[in-house]
Each structure stands twice: as structure tokens, then as C-alpha cells.
Amino acid sequence: MLKIFTKLFGSKHEKDVKKIKPIVDQINELYGPLQSLSDEAFRNKGTELRKKVRDSLIPIEKNIADTEKKLDNPDLSHEENEQLNDTLDNLRKEYETATASILDEVLPETFALVKETCRRLKGHTYEVMGREMVWDMVPYDVQLIGGVVLHQGKIAEMATGEGKTLVSTLPVFLNALTGRGVHVVTVNEYLAQRDMEWMRPVYEYHGLSTGVILSGLYSHQRRNEYLCDITWGTNSEFGFDYLRDNMAGTVEEMVQRDYYFAIVDEVDSVLIDEARTPLIISGPVPNSDTDTKYREIKPWIEQIVRAQQNLVASLLGEAEKTLKTKPNDFDAGLALLRVKRGQPKNNRLSKMLSQTGVGKLIQSVENEYLKDNASRMHEVDEMLYYAVDEKANTIDLTDKGREFLSKLSHQDQDLFLLPDVGSEVAAIDADANLQPSDKVRKKDEVYRLYAERSDSLHTISQLLKAYTLFAKDDEYVVQDGQVNIVDEFTGRVLAGRRYSDGLHQAIEAKENVKIEGETQTMATITIQNFFRLYKKLAGMTGTAETEASEFFEIYKLDVVVIPTNKPIARNDMDDLVYKTRREKYNAITSKVQELVAKGQPVLVGTASVEVSETLSRMLRAKRIQHNVLNAKQHAREADIVAMAGQKGAVTIATNMAGRGTDIKLGEGIREMGGLFILGSERHESRRIDRQLRGRAGRQGDPGESIFYVSLEDQLMRLFGSERVISVMDRLGHEEGDVIEHSMITKSIERAQKKVEEQNFAIRKRLLEYDDVMNQQREVVYSRRRKALKMDRLTADIMDLLLDYCNTVVKKFHEANDPAGLEEQVMRELMVEFKPDPSAFEREPYEKSAEELFKAASEFYHRKESDLPDDIMRQIEKYAVLSVIDQKWREHLREIDGLREGINLRAYGQKDPLLEYKQEAYKLFVDLLQEIEHETLSLAFKLFPITPEESEAIEARQRQQAINQERLVAQHKEAESAYEVSPNASVDSTMSMPGDEIVVQQPIRAEQKPGRNDPCPCGSGKKYKNCCGTNE
């Protein structure tokens, strides 16, 4: 029915393109006359356009600036402040509307200008990444359509080789005319620098400046790059700079400006594949015993894993023996189900699953035990030492496993069970024989015991995961004594990224490399919430249509499929399905041999480093020359890709998503059928498979693509094999036979859709959790920025003082304790206030509160008059910033702890998300109260220091600046929707972070100390008598 309607009325994408066609016609009309202009007259056109845009926006910008200046007035009443803020909000909305209006007006003329600029650059030679490149590009009509779509804040899906990089110049140029800065986001730094150097001539022709953010740049260099009209960089660099700006100690340390317009290249990779990995700036946890903890427990885990492997081997042997005589035996099926629960990646089990009827038998046994809400699944698991749920990525110790570990560790089995805190605390409260002090002590013991056991069980769980669910050269590689995660979507090593929640340390212990210390979160934001900061967001990719609903639901981004310049001539064949991996690999090598003999180039796509190296060994055995491109050979990437389209070339590459380089065909290859794409297995995401197919058939070139699949592949094993196995069983397939049918291909795509839906649910859930933090982050960062710019600080402190006076007086008035009030006010504000005891009891508390406010404000104003104005403002700024930074870090730690355990609330029939929102709100209310209280106290108590104290503090600050090198920015790899940040305690020494947090090259904290200065090592001696003795 849907197909009939589409035929009658056209698809959504056809309608989208049809609406833009008149704009394209208008661009081409304006393009013609520009060709006859002289260079000078043509350049003047660009200047005129820029002036036209700026002139239309300057009046509103002036109104905004004037309103902001009025808000700086410390004498404003609360009502006046509110009115001005409302006016400012309306002016900003008006500014965005005016910007959109003027840009739409000049769009046809600007796009025509860019097109003519490209024509004039034809034949010119430029250096791009050290290579000479001749400019030969002028936008086609379909590229103009793509440019309009991007300007409208949508996602343009364009096939590989259709010139996405050139398309981006059109909306980037147009939006850069505003002078507000445009950000172009790429998947890696190589592409950021390459695209900047490649497209720079178009922008520089008309005086627009270009910059690129690279990981090794210092703050002042970054600031200069952000001040350019157009700035390229990776999503993580832009995100980390946002976090660092919100940790800055001065306005001068901040590097970014307005978040106006961002175009995200490979938008699906950035906004979907990386959406589960939050950006985290973390610092070391002092006195962490991570290394000892993992090393101590590791031998126990190795023994329990070996015991489970022996048990699994025994169960498999029994099942194999029974199935020879009784093919449908229930007990044999139960044994195999236990093997599946105990060691799901077992090779012998994978081979047995390819036998007729075995998969069906295991499924029927599992269905039997899953009845009545899986009430009998414990009977399956009780024989095992631990049960593995591969789909959920979880491992549970059984009673048998706990008993095994208690014998190994010579400790009570109860040590591997968490105490029921609630019931134990209730029992203590109900015990009438205990004194109040004894109750407090016993409760503390219960909480301590829970924390210790929880920590040990967590370490055991993470080590078990490391040994059973994470394989070397698949999920990670070990290079130079470090465990590096491999991106499952691109096959690249993710430098600097770590698994969260202790899993990375567990893998380091397993691989016998140095175990890095635990970290604490200093600042964090998810990719989703960072990109929501932009007023306008757009993206381009070759594959977005399959995720269109997610793009719209999460980011409110519409997807428009742009037609190709020439029809796609690639032949996409149905999948070939084999029973075992061995059969599949043999078939792949035979096919490669056949293609080499013919001279047709072939690209073999693999899902892991391990598979790429296995196929490489098999091809070497057949003496077939080939190149391998995976996480271990990434340095040769550009050269390998450049040769992949030549005659007889064989290239094995882990997932080609995000490679960013087109494979151009050599001479005579078109006649052979073009590039042959051979996928060695289906990926979890249809999008990644489409990207691999898209490497062939660029710009109307011929090409072929096919996937070879086996029932032992991860996707088939977890989600898709039952239906396919039953089909193969009915057809009576023997070893070595292959099945090829569109029904099988559709079945595999259904399995992929199932996984995509599951992953979307996880990303959506993560966002729902982070939305709670996002609202809190916005409030805290907004207060911090206000303090950094020293906006109305004195007036705010007076507001805090008024609230404080009312709260504290009311508290002591109710208790009739004037002496207590006097003592607390002196301790917290250093203000002498002695209320008359008889009047205090007789009169309403508001009168005493008024008297206290008068006394405290007089004290504060005396302090102001005694100190220079700039010193007083610095004291206020320091009071606000230092308290916010310390309390925010403590709050992040508490939120980490809350998020870690909130899932357990589901066992009590409670919605974990709702519980999380309620608990997080309570924590946030407490945070704001603490910030206000301690800020007020610090502002009153801080005074300038003597020269001698100054010397000692400077020495400490120099040491602290050196300690800053230990802070790292990490794009954290999340295990699941709820495990996205490390569990760490607070390092109170880091109260005022500076700007050089991620250190890619050596940093000098400041100038070398003088000979009579205190030594920066913190010894207290003079530099000449300590570290400077040899100079």
C-alpha cells in the first residue's frame, strides 16, 4: 500500500529536492553574469555581500550589548534585573530570526559567488598535507541542492564520491558572512587539517579566515583558531575545549566563542556511533590502590575461568556423545544451553550450532526454562561457576562460584555477598538495648562493610568480563605496553580512550601491562548535549537514512537524500551464507584468487583486526600479494587506500567507515567491472555495511559488492541464526555448501534492525539520564561564567547575605539560642553580632535578621572601602569560582555513585530513571545551598595576604601548575547506558584548574624561578639552596 502511495505522490526525499530546485535555478541564473567580471570586481562582490549581512545585524548587536551593559549595574533592583533579562532574551531571539532572514535572502547570490570562485580556481595548484593538488572542482546542481539542505540545518545524505567536502563550502561560506564563526566537525584530525587546507583557497579568495584545532595546541593558539571565520576540528576537541572553558580561572583563559553553526562530516559516525561515549576531563585519585586490588584478585579469576572452561568441555563432550544416538535429547540440549551460558564464544559450540537441529534444540530447552518470567533459569546456571549474558554484556557469580572463590581466598563465602543494608539498619534502630552512640557506630560498620564488599565484587565482575567478553585484537589491541580500544565502526585505534568503571584496568591486569590509576571526573558532557548547544546544526554522510528517526527524535534533524550526479552502476549481490567460519574463509580466499587472476581490484572488509590477520595469513599461504589496513597498520592508511583501485590490487581493511578517502579506479578497471567489495561478515549496523558497499561505484563508476556470512559470525550467533539454521536444515545443506537467497539477506537485515533498535534504546536512555545532569550543568556553568566576568558579584553576595540572615536567625530564634547565633555568625562571617537575649526571645525573628543584615553589610562595605576595588572584585571572584569548582567536583562524584547503583531499584519495582531524577534533584538542591553558603562565608573571610605568605603560595601554585599535567581529557568508552563515568573520590588540591589540561607536548608551568624565590618543589627552601644548587 505504501509503495502505491509513494508512486502516486512521490517520496519524501523527492518532494524535499523538488522544493529546492527553484533556488538552484536562481543560483545558476546569477552564476552566468559573474563569469564576465574582472577579478577585482568579482572580489568586490564578496565584500559587498559580507557588508550587507553585517549591516543588517549590527543594530541588534548594539542593542544586545547596551542591555548587557545595563545588567552590569550593581544597583539594579530584582524587578529591574528580571525585566532586563527578559528584554535580552527577546533581543537574542530577534537576532537569530534576523540572521536566518538575511542569509536566506543572500543565499542564491552567495552560492553563485562560491561556484564562480571554484571555476576561477580551476587549474591552480595547491599544497594539501604535503602533496601538490590541482583544483578541478566546480559544484554540480545536485551539490548546490546539498548546500541548501545543509544551510537549512538538515542532514544531507550523499553517496560516496559525490563531493561532500565541496558541498560544505557553500553553506560554510554563507554562514561565515555573519562573522560569528562556523565550525566544521570531522571524525579525525587528519581530515580536519586536510579539508581546511583543501578548501582554504575558496574562502581566502574573498578574505575569509580559516583555522584548525589540533590536539597539541596551547590555549592562546586555540583562541586564535576559534577567532577565524571558519574553524575545523574533531568533535572531541570542540567538546573538550567547551569543558576546559568552564574550568578556566580567568576570562583570558577561555578559547571558544559563540556556538552558532556547526556542520558535522560523517554525521552518523559522530552523533550516533559516538553518542554512548561521553567526554570526560578527569584527574588522578590520590592514594588509589587500584593496581594492588586487581593484581590480588587476578589469580583467583584465572583459576575460576579455567575451572569453567573444563566444566564446559566436559558438558560439550557429554552432549556430543548423546546427540549421536538421540538427536533431540532434552538433557543434551540442557548441557549445550549451559555451555552457551558459561562460555558463549566457545569454538566447539559454534561448530555444533551449524549441525542440523542443534540450534533448534537449544532454543526449545531455553524456552522451557524461560517460562513464568524465567523463574527456572537458576536451575540452568546452578551447575556453572558464573553465568554470562552476552547480549546484555553482564556476568553473575553463582553460589558454586562464590564457594570456589571463598576456598581460593581462604575467606568466608559471605564476603562475596552484599549485605542487606536496609534491613540491618532497621534492626539496629529497633534495638532498644543500644545507646544512640552505639547505633551510629554500628550503622557506620554496616555501611563500611557494604562499601568494601561492593568494591571487591565490582573488581571480580570487571575481571570476569575482561577474561570472557573482551578479546585481544578484536575489541582492543596491546601496543607499546598499553591497552588501546579499537573502534568497532572504523577499525581505528581510539588513542586516549578508556573503558569506564574499572573495566580498562581489568583488561590491563589480564594483559600484564601497567595498570593505570583510578581517576575522578572533573567535568563531563555527552556528545548529544554538546551539539545541542549550537543554534544551528547540520550534517552530511553517505548513510543516514536508516537512522533518520533517531536523528529527528534526539537532535530534531531532518534527513534529505540528495540524488547522485550520475546513476549508481554498482551491482549489489545477495549474501552467501556458510555454516562455519572456516568454510567462509576458504570461499573468500578462492574468490580473491579468482579476481586477482582476472586483474580486478578487490577490497575485503573485515569487522576486527583478528579476522583481517587470519585472511592475510591465508592469502600469504596462496602467495597472493595484498595490503592490510587495520588498527595496527593505520600509519600507511593513505598510501594503501590510494593503491586499492589499481589493477590486481588486493586490500584487506577493517571497517572502512570514516576513512574519508575515495578509491579511484586505475586504467582499464572499468571494463573489468570496477572495484569488487567483499564483506567478510555483516556488521551490527546496516549503515556500516552500506558504507563498505559505497566504496565502489563512485560517480557512476561500475562496481560489485557481496557479503560472505557464516552461522558462527557474532551477529548471526546472537540475533539471526535460528531462522537461517531452520532453512538450511530443511534444505539438507552439507558441509561446504553455500546458500544464496534474497530471503536470507532480508533475514540478516531484520537481525541488524533488531540490534540497531536495541542500541538506539541504550543511547536514548543514556540521554535521558544525562539530560538531568545537563540542566544542572547549565545552571552551574552559567553561574561560573557570570563570576568569571565579574558581573554584579557584590550585589549577588548581598542577596546571599539577606537569605543567610533570614535562615540562620530563624533557626536560632526557634531554639531561643542567641549565644549559638552569635557563635555561628562569628565563625562563618567573622562578624561580631550580640543580640539582646530578652529582646531576641520577645521580638519576631525578622527584626533580629534585619539587625544582623545591617551589621554584616556594614562590615562588608568597610572591607570594601579598605581595599582597592580591583582587589575586592578578585576576592569575590575567587570566592565564587573556588567554591563552585570544588563543590561541582564533589557533586559529579556523588552523581557517578548514584548512577552506578540506581539500576538495582528496578528489583524493587521502581523506575530507575524516575528514582535517579528525584535523587539527583535532591543532591542538586543541596549543592546550590552549599555553594551559596560557602561562597558567602569565603567572601567575608578572605583578606589580602602578606608578601611572605604570597611567596609560599606562589611556590604551591607552581607545583600545582606542574600537577595540572596529570589531568587528562578522555573520550570515555561506555560499557552500557548506565556505566559512563569512573567511580572516583575528590582531589581537593585542584581547586582552580588552569587551561593546559590535556598535555600533548611538554609544558613549562611558568618562567624559571629566581635564585631567592621559594623552590617550586615545595620544600620551603630558597631555590638557590634546593633544586637550583647546581646552576
From Swiss-Prot:
Membrane topology category: Peripheral membrane protein
Cellular localisation: Cell inner membrane; Cytoplasm
EC primary class: translocase
Predominant cellular place of this UniProt entry's protein: membrane
Coiled-coil stretches noted in the UniProt entry, renumbered to this chain: none
Molecular function per GO: ATP binding; metal ion binding; protein-exporting ATPase activity
Residues that, per the record, bind ATP: 143, 161-165, 662
Region (Disordered): 1001-1021
GO biological processes: intracellular protein transmembrane transport; protein import; protein targeting; protein transport by the Sec complex
Presence of keyword Manganese: no
GO cellular component: cell envelope Sec protein transport complex; cytosol; plasma membrane
Catalytic activity: ATP + H2O + cellular proteinSide 1 = ADP + phosphate + cellular proteinSide 2
EC number(s) on file: 7.4.2.8
Pfam families: P-loop_SecA, SEC-C, SecA_DEAD, SecA_PP_bind, SecA_SW
InterPro entries the UniProt entry points to: Helicase_ATP-bd (IPR014001), Helicase_C-like (IPR001650), P-loop_NTPase (IPR027417), SEC_C_motif (IPR004027), SecA (IPR000185), SecA_CS (IPR020937), SecA_DEAD (IPR011115), SecA_motor_DEAD (IPR014018)
Signal peptide (UniProt feature, chain positions): none
Binding site for Zn(2+): 1015, 1017, 1026-1027
Family of this protein: Belongs to the SecA family.
NCBIfam families: secA (TIGR00963)
Protein name as catalogued: Protein translocase subunit SecA
